[in-house]
Amino acid sequence: STGPTGVTGTSITATYAFANNTSGTAISVLLGGTNVPLPNNQNIGPGITVSGGNTVFTVANAGNYYIAYTINITASLLVSSRITINGAQLAGTVNAPALATTSFSATIITTLAAGDAISLQLFGLLAVATLSTTTPGAVLTIIRLS
């Protein structure tokens, strides 16, 4: 037999965000970094807000977060990609290839403070990177774990 059902707890993973760019956007990459806009297929749960330019995702609550991204561009470039938190590079998310490529990705679990602002960037080369339309050009997933 089973005991009485307990009180329903809160779901930490109800704090999430998903957004991508399927528009083939041409991004003017600067050496210091250019945020990638993610205006398409947004599914933003409570606890995360997105900026008007669809480039900054701000978390309301401190915690451990799963963050993953993928970027696909139409022509090989010797460009790099990363996640930034409040404008600073997040260690473990930098993809800096030695040879020109068209695909970039990283996944991390990291601790964020309330109010931290997350962005996806291309950086390290003065170039125009055109996001793919045959595969998602750019994808960002954020999930609060604890």
For the regions a language model picked out, list residue spans one by one.
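Extracellular jelly-roll beta-sandwich "head" domains, especially the C-terminal globular C1q domain
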Residues: 4-146
